[in-house]
Amino acid sequence: MRIILGIYSILFVICSISVAQTENEHASLMSLVQTERAFARTSVAKGIRESFLAFFADDGIVFRPHPVRYKETVANTPPPTNPLAVTLNWEPLFADVARSGDLGYTTGPYTLTDNSPEKRQPQHGFFFSVWKKQADGNWRVVLDAGIRTPELYSGPTKFQLAPRLVKESAESRLEPGEGKEMLLNAECELMEVAATDGFVKAFVAHISKDARVYRQGVQPVIGIDSVRAFLSKRPFTQSWKPMKAEVARSADLGYTYGSYEKKERGAAAAMEKGYYARVWKRDATGRWHVVFDVANPLPSNESE
């Protein structure tokens, strides 16, 4: 009887810890989404510049078109005379956060509206932001990118939470520093397989079943079958060089960004150059999967 009671006590403790971790993770995710929405409200009320300065980390990166630190870039730039001449508004539709609650990302549709006398047509697209919890406990953007789409998004508007891929276990825990090394190894493995098997085959083999791929001029491509079909439309090869990788304390979520070069199959010259950003997520077996990928091509005059 004592043995049975002991087993039940252990199971109760394990279940309690699991529930507490799930609740903490959900709370972190909701706080991230609330911060994203506050960011958007500030943008509409006070303008793009002021909102970005308020919600970006000091080392937060944007692509203009090369990666730069936003706060450093605008530090010596005079503020606009009318900060609301153009308004940027957005709404998160999808978000995920690491189990440790210190790193996450959000994405959703945006609209850029011209309020000047010219009243140019609104621009539409999808934003993507990586957030990191700072020492003061606040979420701040560490990387921001996006795509422009030809028309307003008309798909599902219900907010979605990312599916959980990692279960807390002794086998899935990593020592500090191991997560980043493993993530970079996964990125290198993807590059090696792409060099032999082709980018599309390699990429599809390394993504999650519900992965999201963002490319300029088209609506988001979601799901492994849709991604395979989209990338297979035109034969090409792709190479890339990671510039940075960062992983959550729990080592279940991380991101990379860097430069890429895209060529038509058999061609010597690149048909497109630019920068990519990629979110990776680790499953219960310890394997990393790409869950999000966005490309920011350089203007044609810079790609030559």
Name what the model sees in each region.
Residues 122-161, 273-299:
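Short beta-strand edge/turn micro-motifs at domain boundaries
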Residues 58-59, 107-114, 257-263:
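Generic short beta-strand segments
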Residues 19-50, 54-55, 150-201, 205, ...:
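Short, low-complexity N-terminal intrinsically disordered segments enriched in polar/charged residues
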Residues 39-40, 90, 103-107, 128-131, ...:
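Short, structured motif recognition centered on aromatic/hydrophobic residues
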Residues 6-16:
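Bacterial N-terminal signal peptides
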Residues 1-5:
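Positively charged n-region of N-terminal signal peptides that target proteins for export
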Residues 76-78, 92-97, 110-112, 126-133, ...:
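Hydrophobic/aromatic beta-strand elements that line small-molecule binding cavities or substrate pockets
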Residues 26-33, 47-102, 122, 200-251, ...:
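A solvent-exposed, acidic/Ser-Thr-rich amphipathic alpha-helical stretch
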